Amino acid sequence: MKAQPKASHFIGGAFVEDKAGKPPPVIYPATDEEIASLYSATPGIIEAAYAAALKAQGEWAALKPVERGRILRRTAEILREKNRKLSKLETLDTGKALQETLVADAASAADALEFFGGIISGFNGEFVELGGSFAYTRREALGICVGIGAWNYPIQIAAWKSAPALAMGNAFIFKPSENTPLSALALAEAYKEAGLPDGLFNVVQGYGDVGAALVNHRLTAKVSLTGSVPTGRRIMAQAGEQLKHVTMELGGKSPLIVFDDADLESAIGGAMLGNFYSTGQVCSNGTRVFVHKNIRERFIERLVERTRKIRIGDPFDEATQMGPLISAAQRDKVLSYIKKGKAEGATLACGGGVPKLQGFDKGFFIEPTVFADVTDTMTIAREEIFGPVMSVLEFSDEDEVIARANDSEFGLAAGVFTADLSRGHHVIGQIKAGTCWINAYNLTPVEVPFGGYKQSGIGRENGIAALAHYSQIKTVYVEMGKVDSPY
């Protein structure tokens, strides 16, 4: 099973190779089989990407916004036309079940391109009347923007970052995770097919040193990262030394609160989506599930029953509901957290082991895991695990659960399940998190902003807000009379 691209990098509208770079192997997580071999970007590759971006950006920014938007919308159409092919590529690259990638990856990328391509012509500055004279503002491109992606949603992240950047008239250089380098190249081909001028979307592969080179490059105007909090701190410090714009979409340990009047099946479904989708490798997951004491036993009993029915196996079988984790290292990390949870006194309600799957004995699979009797101070309730491990905590009243939910360095997301919408709005209003749901979880339409509070990030992806993060404001004062000067 191979998925070797034409070359490692895409620069100036063409595939480019330089075999002097360190070769990161591309592994299919379900079998531990190498499916492609790419080369990390050398300094020459990086400089070529900036030269191509610099050459193209000025003319692109000068185009009418509606013309830029037309190309983005055409790219969205191409992604939808090729959705099954792209979804299979994403499944190979990530190990995620095809059942998921068909609806959540290239499809979401297309949604972002269509959205930003449609609204950019209406994203304008302000006019201010000043008693005869007036002022106006212009939204202008930043220049060359850099995106650094994560391995859980490769093509989605590449589009979520590049679509608003390109819509605003910027050029874009994207570095995928070294674990999942393939689909960003497919997105580059789609942009090319749609008519995007050469040099505006470039892909360079590599490890953290390549990302650091992009962040520190003198021509980089903005950096957008999806990654861990430690990586975000490091990149933000580097960018801050040169006062570069940043968007940081980082980790979380989000609370999901279930009151005793909630629809039990919906709440359980939301908790499962918020812990087991993409094998738990979602930054916004609601991994601290607070359940009211009156329904705790019923909730856990039904949760365990439904969790044990999750189908784990061949990611290309569309009946499969959960694939493997991204790597052996990630599987071992998750297993270490499960071990720690048991050692600290949490009750293992189900899962916790490595399933035996015929034909996939070398894959990085793990059982969906539920812990009960979890307390706020346990490691599994404090640290981001990034795997299918749910912690169920009991609470008694509203004020208590709000305080406990907020007792975290993270603030990416939160959810509330209740039949009382007034209470739902009140609780969400008190939660310190940037992306919240009432009677739902982990739904992320591109029309609304996505991002976090506290250590979970700065700036926003998606929604009209994203355009503001890829632009700068110019204020112009126009005097309609003579200059009144005391000199």
From Swiss-Prot:
Cofactor note (record): Binds 2 potassium ions per subunit.
UniProt: K(+) 1 binding residues: I27, D93
Cofactor: K(+)
SUPFAM superfamilies, A to Z: ALDH-like
Assembly with partners or alone: Dimer of dimers.
GO molecular function per UniProt: betaine-aldehyde dehydrogenase (NAD+) activity; metal ion binding
InterPro entries, sorted: Ald_DH/histidinol_DH (IPR016161), Ald_DH_C (IPR016163), Ald_DH_CS_CYS (IPR016160), Ald_DH_CS_GLU (IPR029510), Ald_DH_N (IPR016162), Aldehyde_DH_dom (IPR015590), BADH (IPR011264)
List of residues binding NAD(+): G149, A150, W151, K175, P176, S177, E178, S228, V229, P230, T231, G251, C283, E384
GO BP: glycine betaine biosynthetic process from choline
This enzyme's EC code(s): 1.2.1.8
Pathway note: Amine and polyamine biosynthesis; betaine biosynthesis via choline pathway; betaine from betaine aldehyde: step 1/1
Protein name, UniProt field: Betaine aldehyde dehydrogenase
Active-site residues from the entry: K161, E249, C283, E461
Family, similarity comment: Belongs to the aldehyde dehydrogenase family.
Catalytic activity annotation: betaine aldehyde + NAD(+) + H2O = glycine betaine + NADH + 2 H(+)
HAMAP family noted in UniProt: BADH
Residues that bear Cysteine sulfenic acid (-SOH): C283
